[in-house]
């Protein structure tokens, strides 16, 4: 039911194209995955999302458990029917949100107790419960519960959290019993190569349908992000889809693809869109600026998204300056289409044996010149 098929390899780097087969369709990789935290990509309908070429989206277990609750989603027929999305869905376990958003009361090997950020009530999440929630949600891919410490934590604290992540992974595997849902483990270890290698090898030993690398782009220096991207893949299985969590810039995506990563997600396209900022090549255009008031060109004349085909920068500037919701939605839609188009072009370049020339991260000028 779940299969990852590698369809081509770059002769000079670790980049590859592939097809990840799921019960709700296939995902052509490399691929960017829009974030729909609460079973919605903010301001964008499922029909619009399909028009961008999106093939898989991410929703969040932590947030959906708190509101509206997994039992309601299950009663609706599962998350696909609940949000009217016919393609694959991956649910993040919520580990990052628990440790970054909630006021923690207690962390133990059994799980985490915290205050609900919505109403202050006490909530307890264990690895077993997190898996059961995701089984009720009915996503195609469930993520193991992990402990993601702050990037400022010292090596001893990160090692302690890593042992907890590994213990929880074992419990997640033992609890997960849904044949039509894949379980991915998550590699942690912070900026420490020894811990990253240890975690990659341990997580890989479970032979799960896919594997993710977490604890990246959580406030650390860019050099540390690149170090993890360059180092960890050599310890991951080749025949599994590799998911790099929380990455959405062109440079980091191209670097990650060069090192053999396949799937990416990031909130930036919609977060920036809601503030009036649009992606253009490897730049960001703040459409709130006065210089766009009389600019009747689209955000990107080479982009085929609904926004660029139908609306000018001047109109979007007008919407943003007047706090019109439509403007935020249209820019977010373009930003998602931009990243989908970028990963699609990377796939074409890999198949045509020109990835190194066109998209390798050290060739930043080729990205800036918009070869895709």
UniProtKB/Swiss-Prot annotation:
Active site per database record: 92, 265
GO MF term list: metal ion binding; tRNA-guanosine(34) queuine transglycosylase activity
InterPro entries: ArchSynthase1/Queuine_TRR (IPR050076), TGT (IPR004803), TGT-like_sf (IPR036511), tRNA_ribo_trans-like (IPR002616)
Keywords per UniProt: Glycosyltransferase, Metal-binding, Queuosine biosynthesis, Transferase, tRNA processing, Zinc
Entry's cofactor comment: Binds 1 zinc ion per subunit.
GO cellular component term of the entry, any: cytosol
Annotated residues for binding of Zn(2+): 303, 305, 308, 334
Pathway: tRNA modification; tRNA-queuosine biosynthesis
HAMAP family: Q_tRNA_Tgt
Self-association state and partner proteins as the record states: Homodimer. Within each dimer, one monomer is responsible for RNA recognition and catalysis, while the other monomer binds to the replacement base PreQ1.
UniProt record similarity statement: Belongs to the queuine tRNA-ribosyltransferase family.
Protein name from the UniProt record: Queuine tRNA-ribosyltransferase
Gene from which this protein is expressed: tgt
């Amino acid at each position: 039911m779940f299969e990852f098929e590698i369809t081509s390899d770059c002769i000079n780097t670790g980049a590859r194209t592939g097809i990840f087969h799921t019960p709700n369709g296939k995902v052509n990789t490399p691929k960017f995955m829009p974030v729909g935290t609460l079973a919605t990509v903010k301001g964008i309908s499922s029909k619009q999302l399909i028009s961008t070429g999106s093939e898989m989206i991410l929703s969040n277990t932590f947030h959906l458990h708190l509101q509206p609750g997994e039992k309601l989603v299950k009663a609706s027929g599962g998350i696909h029917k609940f949000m009217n999305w016919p393609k694959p869905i991956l649910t993040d376990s919520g580990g990052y949100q628990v440790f970054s958003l909630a006021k923690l009361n207690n962390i133990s090997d059994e799980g985490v107790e915290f205050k609900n950020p919505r109403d202050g009530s006490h909530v307890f999440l264990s690895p077993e419960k997190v898996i059961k929630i995701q089984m009720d949600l009915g996503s195609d891919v469930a993520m193991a519960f992990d402990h993601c410490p702050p990037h400022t934590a010292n090596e001893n604290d990160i090692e302690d959290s890593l042992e907890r992540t590994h213990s929880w992974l074992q419990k997640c595997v033992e609890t997960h019993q849904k044949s039509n849902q894949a379980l991915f483990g998550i590699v942690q270890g912070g900026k420490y190569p020894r811990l990253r290698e240890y975690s990659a090898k341990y997580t890989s030993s479970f032979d799960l349908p896919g594997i993710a690398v977490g604890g990246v782009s959580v406030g650390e220096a860019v050099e540390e992000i690149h170090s993890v991207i360059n180092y960890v893949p050599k310890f991951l299985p080749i025949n599994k889809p590799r998911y790099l969590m929380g990455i959405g810039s062109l440079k980091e995506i191209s670097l990650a693809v060069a090192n053999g990563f396949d799937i990416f997600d990031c909130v930036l396209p919609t977060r920036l869109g809601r503030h009036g900022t649009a992606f253009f090549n490897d730049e960001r255009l703040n459409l709130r600026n006065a210089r766009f008031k009389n600019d009747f060109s689209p955000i990107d004349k080479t982009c085929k998204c609904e926004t660029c085909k139908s609306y000018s920068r001047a109109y979007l500037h007008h919407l943003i300056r007047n706090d019109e919701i439509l403007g935020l939605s249209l820019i977010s839609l373009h930003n998602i289409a931009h990243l989908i188009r970028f990963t699609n072009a990377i796939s074409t370049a890999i198949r045509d044996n020109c990835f190194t020339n066109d998209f390798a991260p050290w060739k930043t000028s080729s990205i800036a010149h918009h070869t895709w």
